């Protein structure tokens, strides 16, 4: 008898779903009143020139990267010719050799600015410290 109750219950759920679907289908949706079948066609008439692709990186960046790789390959070639170094330090020497020019360029560009800012900060601290000490006397 339990199975019969469940079967009747399942059938009633199916009937409820069918009636809900019927009601939804009977009602007219106002969103689609002014809709025509032509509106779902998308015409692409603007011609895009595919030859004028925008490069992802600038030519300056590309040339700098090319130079880094050239230095890298030159360093590797030099290391292959000179077998008098220990293999333990080969990678370390390679990295140092590659980073020196980059580090020099970065320091040349940024070190004066960093030093100036740090000196200004320290001078401000000294001035504030001296003002506090002068006001205590």
From Swiss-Prot:
<protein>
    <recommendedName>
        <fullName>Uncharacterized protein RP225</fullName>
    </recommendedName>
</protein>
<dbReference type="InterPro" id="IPR019632">
    <property type="entry name" value="DUF2497"/>
</dbReference>
<dbReference type="Pfam" id="PF10691">
    <property type="entry name" value="DUF2497"/>
</dbReference>
């Amino acid at each position: 008898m339990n199975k019969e109750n469940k079967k009747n219950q399942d059938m009633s759920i199916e009937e409820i779903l069918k009636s809900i679907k019927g009601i939804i289908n009977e009602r007219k949706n106002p969103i689609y009143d002014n809709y025509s079948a032509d509106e779902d066609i998308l015409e692409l008439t603007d011609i895009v020139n595919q030859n004028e692709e925008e490069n992802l990186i600038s030519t300056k960046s590309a040339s700098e990267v090319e130079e880094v790789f050239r230095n890298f390959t030159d360093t590797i070639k030099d290391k292959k010719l000179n077998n008098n170094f220990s293999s333990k330090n080969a990678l370390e020497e390679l990295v140092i050799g590659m980073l020196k020019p980059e580090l020099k360029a970065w320091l040349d560009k940024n070190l004066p600015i960093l030093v100036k800012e740090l000196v200004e900060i320290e001078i401000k601290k000294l001035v504030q410290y001296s003002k506090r000490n002068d006001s205590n006397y």
